[in-house]
């Protein structure tokens, strides 16, 4: 407006406004000039003060089908006039778009992990890659970056505060145990846990954070249903799986849980005999034994997931359930028992590297089908208490994050060149610290999103 004042001062009308004709003509011409200059100045100022449009946020062409429970929503807001760029806001109330936090890339993170193999006592020896002599450390310096938004780093103090007087249970196989150990390592940087319970083999355990009255547990249930692997102390050659009976190790405790992370996994690929209504109905990989029908692992996996999801979806159950998807392995040139190895030192990038094995693709397809079937049916009557924790894509991009040969200390010590390929590799579980730590970032965001939706 200072420029308008300067223009106004430069045009002064002298003498009596209605004097002579010559004076009136001068007044008229000066008035016209005055208003023209004001118009031009106004146009100039408005044009140069207009805010540029905020760029449109890209939508993910590879995103999953619409989630009936809204689990992958991270909200984004448009930039304000004072903002230099489009700002991603987690937990915003002004939702303008949804971001699929499960699609993205691993980006360099020089800050590294929250904990180390020295500061955490909960790392099992076969996942303590640095202690076992792994020479590279670059696999520790990456973080997960969703394609269209930012993901907050896990805040252990805030998490413990939010979980005050709560119980979180992990149910599944050794990958679930791997996950809970990662979470323990992060949380123990704030407060060390009390050991409350463990079974004979330390596969099922319960811990407590005393200052927060927060209980954390892991329940060993690799099939999620009743499975018989021993009889009178002698292991079966084939595992007997009851496809219509949930495992009471977790169902008997279920009423206590506030949050549950549950998942299936690789155990369904083992040789198994199927029981339904206490009768043998078929098998997987039974190779013609006793003339049983080969039904395959996909048959059993679908049956079990359907039974599990129906149970946790029952309206009288209070627990909020995070259904975690399958974890791909990264064995190359063989499997765990046939010389397979994983010696990569860098992540893959989205869309350019890394393909899931056919069995992993099939299992993931079944997981998504059964999840959407259950949640869609459930929402017809009420809000779903089940959300998806889709760690498959992000895990596929991390072939560098496994123990590989470093599941034991100094695995190549004393070996000659021709014997190096005889060292057994672990290309399924994850080093601690390692990529699995980022699963907790996703887990927390999914939990927070669900809580926000319940309040709306």
From Swiss-Prot:
Contains 2 motifs that are conserved in esterases, but it is unlikely that this protein belongs to the catalytically active pectin esterases. This is Protein trichome birefringence-like 25. GO terms for molecular function: O-acetyltransferase activity. It comes from Arabidopsis thaliana (Mouse-ear cress). Disulfide bonds: none annotated. Keywords: Membrane, Signal-anchor, Transmembrane, Transmembrane helix. May be involved in the O-acetylation of mannan. May act as a bridging protein that binds pectin and other cell wall polysaccharides. Probably involved in maintaining esterification of pectins. It is found in: Membrane. Its main location: membrane. The chain crosses the membrane at residues 26-42. A motif (DCXHWCLPGXXDXWN motif) lies at residues 426-440. Belongs to the PC-esterase family. TBL subfamily. A motif (GDS motif) lies at residues 172-174. It is a single-pass type II membrane protein. InterPro entries: TBL, TBL_C, TBL_N. It comes from the Eukaryota. GO terms for cellular component: membrane.
